[in-house]
Amino acid sequence: MCPLMAENHEVIEEGNSSELPLSAEDAKKLTELAENVLQGWDVQAEKIDVIQGNQMALVWKVHTDSGAVCLKRIHRPEKKALFSIFAQDYLAKKGMNVPGILPNKKGSLYSKHGSFLFVVYDWIEGRPFELTVKQDLEFIMKGLADFHTASVGYQPPNGVPIFTKLGRWPNHYTKRCKQMETWKLMAEAEKEDPFSQLYLQEIDGFIEDGLRIKDRLLQSTYVPWTEQLKKSPNLCHQDYGTGNTLLGENEQIWVIDLDTVSFDLPIRDLRKMIIPLLDTTGVWDDETFNVMLNAYESRAPLTEEQKQVMFIDMLFPYELYDVIREKYVRKSALPKEELESAFEYERIKANALRQLI
């Protein structure tokens, strides 16, 4: 399967949709686009399949006499795309299981057509992980640990900006708390809406918790850890999960679609894997939590201080924030019950995590 993918450096601090069938005319245009772009590579296409064609990120499977390759149009700002392209090349050449990048005829890792960058990758065959199966859950967490470890040492070429979130968490907490406060004004304007009524009744306590969590983070080893990591940072995938991983032959764990990578503490990816998964059950599942953490630590152990930082970050109401944002920013018509479930999960999660801190 295809990836769906400081000297002389600018440092930039950063703060799955369904595919509709393509018309025959659109498919023909996309195939012609691929044929045109591929002229820049030593690739003789025998057949071209459009894999993803209704999004800004386009993906083709290109069949050649020596096997399949993947052509992708990257839907990212150019500076961000370059950071991730060179990161993927670094990891592949280091032996990490990420799709290798095929240079074009000029020796470049990418070609630019219009305002987009195009890249040709190795085509990876494998199956997606099933996270209800313990062995798959362990595999995917071990793959994440290997990714973090292998990424240490990456520095983009001169002129390519560095994308980092190191040291930015306290600001992110503050921003989200302010947004949840501002959204009260939107709820006030919808006083007849049950979702908004519940939001106004309950949200203040969670905003206060978020600010207390920020203070707790600053009192932990978060700051010294980030300062230490800035000297030799690892990458965070930031979108790690079943959509961006594959289990290949001989239990090879492949990490694909590195478009979102950034420098940050490795525990960011752990939190983004563990907390949403447990949220799907409606209860705090200690067994699943421990399976995931133990599998990761079997490849990349964390110190007790590092785990404390992770538990504090997990306390922040990210999942609740996402539900509220869906309502007031994306204007989705959410029922009151969805907010009730989000509030309840935050309470369950907090009770479990406070026993670990």
Swiss-Prot record:
Gene encoding the protein: cotI
This protein's UniProt keywords: Sporulation
InterPro entries documented for this protein: Aminoglycoside_PTrfase, CotS-like, Kinase-like_dom_sf, Spore_coat_CotS
GO cellular component, one term: endospore-forming forespore
Family listed: Belongs to the CotS family.
Entry annotated with the keyword Chaperone: no
Gene Ontology BP annotations: sporulation resulting in formation of a cellular spore
Main location: other
Record's subcellular location: Spore coat
Protein name per the record: Spore coat protein I
